[in-house]
Amino acid sequence: MRSDVIKKGYIRAPHRSLLRATGLKDDDFKKPFIGVCNSFAEIIPGHFFLNKFAKIIKDEIRKNGCVPFEFNCIGVDDGIAMGHDGMLYSLPSREIIANSVETMMNAHKLDALICIPNCDKIVPGMIMGALRVNVPTIFISGGPMAAGRGKNGEALDLNSTFEAVGAYEVKKINKKELHDIECAACPGAGSCSGMFTANSMNTLCEAMGIALKGNGTILAMTKNRKKLAKKAARRICEIALDDKFKIRNIINKKAVENAMVVDMAMGGSSNTILHMLAISREAGCALDIKELNEISKKTPHIAKIAPSKPEIHMQDVHNAGGINAIMNEVKDLLHLDNLTVTGETLGERIKGAKIKDEDVIHKVENAYSKVGGLAILFGNLAEQGCVIKAAGIIGSRKFSGKAICFNSQDEAIEGISGGKVKKGDVVVIRYEGPKGGPGMQEMLSPTSLIVGRGLGADVALITDGRFSGATRGLCIGHVSPEAAEGGMIGLLKDGDIIDIDVDNFSINVRLSEDEIAERKKEFKYGGKKVQSRWLRQYQKLVTNASNGAILEA
């Protein structure tokens, strides 16, 4: 056992003495030690109940002959951090989480790992840390929140509230209506109810084979969720000492490609691109961003879930057959021979899964589009690529317009709220990339204001920052190189004409090579003055979005 390093032989008497202080007895030292990585946090709706959820898992581990050791990691609620400088800390928190998992598991030489994430950066952070440790690992997330219900029975979610703010500003709704939406949108525990970043990543855990069936879709705090937790706990005990189930044997290049096929088919959050690039690097099978369009070109988009289709949420996906039904529908594009934590291949796992509601999950022959719900655009405005959630486009997939430039998210929010943005504009928000922010803020506030003000089909937005999974509209993020590295987005001027063609994967500004060269000569950027010591460290080490915004020493 890996844990013998801390518990076997006379020389480890001091170590055992410390472990006995936690309640261990003689027989416990013969059992596998299981790390239970929790992310309980009282301020996060997707996490405030995870202390009780973890207890279910630990009790089941004990019943099955192993010793659980729970430890916690931090978590940032992106919705609460949204629209102010708290969002600077969201993406950097992914690295803290990865480092924390690696530190706890390697310092204490635990034999296996069960991870309990739920929201946004916590899921990829735990995956990245687990890949560094490389022991048998299972992911069991807290589960999605149920959709809220409005006065007329319409489905609501967090994005409904953000868009309602924009509607209130232009007097489409009154203060009471705004308050009613606020009070109804998030009815209880769980990760926000649409195919936003958290639920996108939780479903991709199923596609990669590191989580059990239903991980991404069974609602939080339900009997079925608790049953899934117990099943995951039993399984980690079964595989704890089996090297075949080390996480790097599960997450390989095939698993990463499987995840991206599923992501394209269901129109997941654009943040998944950032995280899967980072995860693939940690797994030793680095995905090139250019490969993603090849996957997109062959993958039909068969499921639209909020925000792309506001009335459909994760509970509807589960009732329609879940992620297995989506995978079975696109099985010809998957590596069906890849191993999963259950011991089955992916093909064995999804065999016989049926679509139960074709309004939620379409058949391939009735796909929303023949290409995937995410796309990478290239051109003189993004030589290293940029990302769009094509599934969330409200108007045309082809757009040309005049740039209106803002040098921060705060400037953009002020400009949009002040009525500066008009139909036909391309809103440019720059110096918000991984280095420029630093921290690559999400832009849900400005995009929601645009949609809420009725401009979603008539305005495009591009940024070197990123978007919430709740964003919809013609919104292009992760522009690389970013403005802070002298990228073209930092050289744009108000009035420049920008051409966007999603179906041809292109984004360009109408400037000659000579004009671009001249602007590059004139470019000066001294960098933002960052007060935070942690964010200064992050700014120094982080790479750009085309590399997954990973840290490189």
Swiss-Prot record:
<comment type="similarity">
    <text>Belongs to the IlvD/Edd family.</text>
</comment>
<protein>
    <recommendedName>
        <fullName>Dihydroxy-acid dehydratase</fullName>
        <ecNumber>4.2.1.9</ecNumber>
    </recommendedName>
</protein>
<dbReference type="GO" id="GO:0051537">
    <property type="term" value="F:2 iron, 2 sulfur cluster binding"/>
</dbReference>
<dbReference type="InterPro" id="IPR000581">
    <property type="entry name" value="ILV_EDD_N"/>
</dbReference>
<feature type="binding site">
    <location>
        <position position="120"/>
    </location>
    <ligand>
        <name>Mg(2+)</name>
    </ligand>
</feature>
<feature type="binding site">
    <location>
        <position position="192"/>
    </location>
    <ligand>
        <name>[2Fe-2S] cluster</name>
    </ligand>
</feature>
<dbReference type="Pfam" id="PF24877">
    <property type="entry name" value="ILV_EDD_C"/>
</dbReference>
<dbReference type="Pfam" id="PF00920">
    <property type="entry name" value="ILVD_EDD_N"/>
</dbReference>
<keyword id="KW-0408">Iron</keyword>
<dbReference type="GO" id="GO:0005829">
    <property type="term" value="C:cytosol"/>
</dbReference>
<comment type="function">
    <text>Functions in the biosynthesis of branched-chain amino acids. Catalyzes the dehydration of (2R,3R)-2,3-dihydroxy-3-methylpentanoate (2,3-dihydroxy-3-methylvalerate) into 2-oxo-3-methylpentanoate (2-oxo-3-methylvalerate) and of (2R)-2,3-dihydroxy-3-methylbutanoate (2,3-dihydroxyisovalerate) into 2-oxo-3-methylbutanoate (2-oxoisovalerate), the penultimate precursor to L-isoleucine and L-valine, respectively.</text>
</comment>
<dbReference type="GO" id="GO:0009099">
    <property type="term" value="P:L-valine biosynthetic process"/>
</dbReference>
<dbReference type="InterPro" id="IPR037237">
    <property type="entry name" value="IlvD/EDD_N"/>
</dbReference>
<dbReference type="InterPro" id="IPR020558">
    <property type="entry name" value="DiOHA_6PGluconate_deHydtase_CS"/>
</dbReference>
<keyword id="KW-0001">2Fe-2S</keyword>
<comment type="pathway">
    <text>Amino-acid biosynthesis; L-valine biosynthesis; L-valine from pyruvate: step 3/4.</text>
</comment>
<dbReference type="InterPro" id="IPR042096">
    <property type="entry name" value="Dihydro-acid_dehy_C"/>
</dbReference>
<feature type="binding site">
    <location>
        <position position="119"/>
    </location>
    <ligand>
        <name>[2Fe-2S] cluster</name>
    </ligand>
</feature>
<keyword id="KW-0100">Branched-chain amino acid biosynthesis</keyword>
<dbReference type="GO" id="GO:0004160">
    <property type="term" value="F:dihydroxy-acid dehydratase activity"/>
</dbReference>
<keyword id="KW-0028">Amino-acid biosynthesis</keyword>
<feature type="binding site">
    <location>
        <position position="442"/>
    </location>
    <ligand>
        <name>Mg(2+)</name>
    </ligand>
</feature>
<keyword id="KW-0479">Metal-binding</keyword>
<feature type="binding site">
    <location>
        <position position="78"/>
    </location>
    <ligand>
        <name>Mg(2+)</name>
    </ligand>
</feature>
<comment type="pathway">
    <text>Amino-acid biosynthesis; L-isoleucine biosynthesis; L-isoleucine from 2-oxobutanoate: step 3/4.</text>
</comment>
<keyword id="KW-0456">Lyase</keyword>
<dbReference type="GO" id="GO:0009097">
    <property type="term" value="P:isoleucine biosynthetic process"/>
</dbReference>
<dbReference type="GO" id="GO:0000287">
    <property type="term" value="F:magnesium ion binding"/>
</dbReference>
<keyword id="KW-0460">Magnesium</keyword>
<comment type="subunit">
    <text>Homodimer.</text>
</comment>
<dbReference type="InterPro" id="IPR004404">
    <property type="entry name" value="DihydroxyA_deHydtase"/>
</dbReference>
<keyword id="KW-0411">Iron-sulfur</keyword>
<feature type="modified residue" description="N6-carboxylysine">
    <location>
        <position position="121"/>
    </location>
</feature>
<feature type="binding site" description="via carbamate group">
    <location>
        <position position="121"/>
    </location>
    <ligand>
        <name>Mg(2+)</name>
    </ligand>
</feature>
<dbReference type="InterPro" id="IPR056740">
    <property type="entry name" value="ILV_EDD_C"/>
</dbReference>
<feature type="active site" description="Proton acceptor">
    <location>
        <position position="468"/>
    </location>
</feature>
